Amino acid sequence: MPELVVRMGELAVSSTAGDVLVCVGLGSCIGLALVARHGRACGLAHVMLPESNGRAEEKVGKFADLAVPALVDELVRVGVGPRSLEAVLVGGAQMFAGNSGMEIGARNEAAVRAGLAAAGIPIHAAATAGNTGRTMRVEVGTGAVTAREAGAAEVALR
């Protein structure tokens, strides 16, 4: 199975069965998977920050307010109806105790959830918060989504 690594600020969409979309090192970032209910097309964004504040950004996956609609648009381009999408969220951890006032992970999660609510996309599952990094995998064709915390076993989310 070919792995397509989605780096910070990026997003990717595939409708090729057997592809695996992967986000590695999700700390305060949110891995946002949008999966067509039949699983034949999937998208993944590696969201770094909650808001673009009107800034134009080359990497549309960087900000939650840009990433959610961009990922939906990309899936529509490959023939997925937006009403058939469901979301899985991974990440949003509080990685550094000294940064508790910033709470970037929680703000990222809240912004992604708000974007999904505005788009009418239900959240199927989430593995968020805590204080450890995670890896997220999305299997195109089956729509299976897994998450693995550092030092732990992989867990099926969808």
Please state what every model-predicted region is.
Residues 1-158:
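Active-site microenvironment for binding and transforming phosphate-containing groups
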